[in-house]
Amino acid sequence: MCESELEMSSESESQTKEDESESEEESTEEESTESEEVREAKEAVLEKYKNLGMITGVRNYLNMRKGPSTDYEICGVIFKNCAVEILEEKDGWMKIESGGATGYVSAEYVTTGEKARKLALSSMKYMAEILTDSVDALYEPKEGAEVITTFLKGERYDINGETKDWVEIEAVTELSGYVKRETVYTGYFLDEAIYFSLDGVSETRQDLIRKAFEYYGGTYVWGGKQLTAEGGVDCSGYTMCLYKLFGVQLPEFSGAQAEVGMTVDEDTIRPGDLIFYVGRYPGVIGHVAIYIGNGKIIHAASESKGICVSSWKYGPPVIMKNVMGD
């Protein structure tokens, strides 16, 4: 087994197969109830792939590496039901392209052929992609409304609602923002790999980032402080519990955590540093996330998203902190 996967017992492997079987049944049912317009839109997405693969059989994530063995450096991560373009296969490894990055993964965890196509169709998400260099997300769907944050070109967000002129998208944790329809493309997308580089980053910070990904997909619970399947965490509970594993003591709340450590900026921030954001109330810190590199963060985002990866500028950063003491 590739060292990049979390260890799975035979019981959990069996469960994975059951999950995949259920997924296929759900896919068939969904396809039969979808409109012709939706089916055509989804099929158009698949046409972009010459040799489609879908990641399956992993509990949390799979590491992408710079070469075809576990001896090579990790260059990104890819999650269950993510789509990849298969470039070549040799000696149990596949060279893939996904999310704008190229790397190698164990072929054992890549589903191909008709199964991949069906899984892809059932896994697509209806989202909004930013078309212009920057777009202001507004509190209300009207010109001159207060700005929540600014989105950047190429970023994708869940859609909470649509009208003729406006698209409502999740802007900040549990808070929707409105953008003009002509500034976004709305359509179906497949999840892809997340690329980042840990070159020049200390072993401790690398271990912290890898540990953070072990909880990807975990449950968001307001006020939660348990990094377990039965428990759950909120944004500050996630950072507090995670950093404690590495000897860093953080307060319970994001506002208090922002008082810890040394301030950094966009030029000096490193994977493992914390980024703090405004929450529901303008001017008040209400959210914290872990910077993982390449403009991405991992955080306990909301009840609907759980622990996930986002653009680091999904909301306006208030302050960035090095709490590692290095």
Where are these regions (language model features)?
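Boundary regions of SH3-family modules and the immediately adjacent low-complexity/disordered segments
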Residues: 1-51, 85, 98-126, 170-206
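Soluble non-cytosolic domains of exported or imported proteins
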Residues: 68-72, 145, 202-206, 229-234, ...
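Short aromatic-glycine-enriched beta-strand elements
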Residues: 91-95, 164-168, 295-296
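Second-shell loop/turn segments in exported
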Residues: 194-200, 220-229, 278
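Catalytic cysteine-centered active-site loop
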Residues: 219-271, 318
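...with weaker cross-activation on analogous glycine-rich loops/strands in unrelated enzymes
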Residues: 248-309, 313, 326
